[in-house]
């Protein structure tokens, strides 16, 4: 089985998360996408982070697709960093082929992630274009360091079968939603009480 992993705070989850997942399912020919709702992002201020249970329920409501599974795995296995989550999944679920899914905004700062080179060496990565982040992402230290492992976009369906490091930059999905833009200054979610 080919599984895409989309990690994040999902604070709040929104239709772009769903659209990215469905886009990845199709373009990467995945069987499932797992949303890994993190207890907290080490690179972000977590003071306005809603309670994990509320984010999980909201994510389930937004996902609304049997191929998208919402998980709080990181809180269960007590991992803080993506590399630890990936290592645990690969060790426990050896028969699955994982692909890490991230937006271009995350590629732009991927070099700041704990053990980012090891992440790239453990699982193939699909980067979803997020204008206007495209140029910044593709000029980032991580993109430059991993440039020789980049697949042409027309080979995206082969990514899950490639040994890491391997990555692809997927274009064509034009959404400009972000969780940051859907939060009020006090951290509450816009459109909710």
Curated annotation (Swiss-Prot):
UniProt keyword annotations, A-Z: ATP-binding, NAD, Nucleotide-binding, Nucleotidyltransferase, Pyridine nucleotide biosynthesis, Transferase
Pathway: Cofactor biosynthesis; NAD(+) biosynthesis; deamido-NAD(+) from nicotinate D-ribonucleotide: step 1/1
GO biological process, one term: NAD biosynthetic process
Broad EC category: transferase
EC identifiers of the protein: 2.7.7.18
Pfam families cross-referenced by the UniProt entry: CTP_transf_like (PF01467)
Chemical reaction(s) catalysed: nicotinate beta-D-ribonucleotide + ATP + H(+) = deamido-NAD(+) + diphosphate
Record-level Gene Ontology MF annotations: ATP binding; nicotinate-nucleotide adenylyltransferase activity
InterPro entries according to UniProt: Cyt_trans-like, NadD/NMNAT, Rossmann-like_a/b/a_fold
NCBIfam families recorded: nicotinate (nicotinamide) nucleotide adenylyltransferase (TIGR00482), PRK00071.2-2 (NF000843), PRK00071.2-4 (NF000845), PRK00071.2-5 (NF000846)
Family, similarity comment: Belongs to the NadD family.
Function: Catalyzes the reversible adenylation of nicotinate mononucleotide (NaMN) to nicotinic acid adenine dinucleotide (NaAD).
Protein's UniProt name: Probable nicotinate-nucleotide adenylyltransferase
Organism annotation: Bradyrhizobium diazoefficiens (strain JCM 10833 / BCRC 13528 / IAM 13628 / NBRC 14792 / USDA 110)
